[in-house]
């Protein structure tokens, strides 16, 4: 109810596959989504929102520039932001982009177990966008990442694991159907930006 009363504007830089469903998830929560990614306006927009989300799912050079500008502007304006490093391990370009964005100090890092393990330097079984590793196997890496970057890390899956590097929480209620529907994780990232 409080979220609906506040109706925060959420700047969602997400991928083409996820835009529609993510916008609808944010709307259903009571927040207001804005799917803005162009470098020409990303920074200006990031300064006036309640939260920013950055998802590298369909990254391109122009989108990457917009992501960096938005993250820098969000930090300058004390706007919290969430990084979703979708399949950062798939290509060298994607990996470099995820590392550059991580260096810009997101408030929250949200990913599946394979993504978090990869960013934390752990070996992973992943090959595409879907997790091949268990949430439990990513917990130590998540705690190390959270401490090293002074952020919250959320490893999502059947049971989510959330940590700031010291405190931990498990969130139950995941569905086995979620991996069968595209953009569920991406939508969760945008929803997190509303809070």
Positions of PLM-derived features:
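Glycine-rich, highly charged phosphate/nucleotide-binding loops
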Residues: 33-41, 62-67
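Glycine-rich phosphate/adenosyl-contacting loop at the front of the ribokinase-like
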Residues: 1-35
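Conserved phosphate/ATP/ADP-binding segment of small-molecule kinases
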Residues: 92-168
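Short pre-catalytic strand/loop immediately N-terminal to key active-site residues, enriched for Gly-Thr
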Residues: 143, 169-182
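Glycine-centered short loops/turns at secondary-structure junctions
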Residues: 30, 76-78, 150
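Short, small-residue alpha-helix embedded
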Residues: 118, 182-195
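Glycine/small-residue-rich loop that forms an oxyanion/phosphate-binding "nest" at active or ligand-binding sites
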Residues: 55, 63-112
């Amino acid at each position: 109810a409080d979220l609906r009363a506040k109706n925060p504007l959420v700047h969602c830089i997400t991928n083409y596959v996820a835009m529609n469903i993510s916008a609808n998830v944010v709307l259903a929560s009571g927040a207001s989504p804005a799917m803005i990614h162009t470098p020409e306006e990303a920074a200006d927009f990031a300064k006036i929102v309640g939260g920013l989300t950055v998802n590298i799912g369909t990254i391109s050079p122009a989108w990457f520039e917009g992501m960096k500008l938005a993250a820098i502007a969000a930090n300058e304006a004390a706007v919290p932001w969430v990084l979703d490093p979708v399949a950062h391990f798939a290509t060298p370009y994607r990996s470099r982009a995820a590392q550059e964005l991580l260096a810009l100090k997101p408030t929250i890092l949200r990913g599946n177990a394979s993504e978090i393990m990869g960013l934390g330097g752990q070996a992973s079984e992943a090959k595409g966008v879907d997790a091949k590793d268990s949430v439990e196997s990513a917990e130590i890496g998540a705690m190390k990442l959270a401490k090293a970057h002074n952020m919250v890390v959320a490893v999502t899956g059947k049971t989510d694991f959330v940590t700031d590097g010291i405190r931990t929480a498990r969130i139950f209620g995941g569905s086995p159907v979620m991996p069968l529907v595209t953009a569920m994780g991406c939508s969760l990232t945008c929803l997190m930006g509303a809070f």
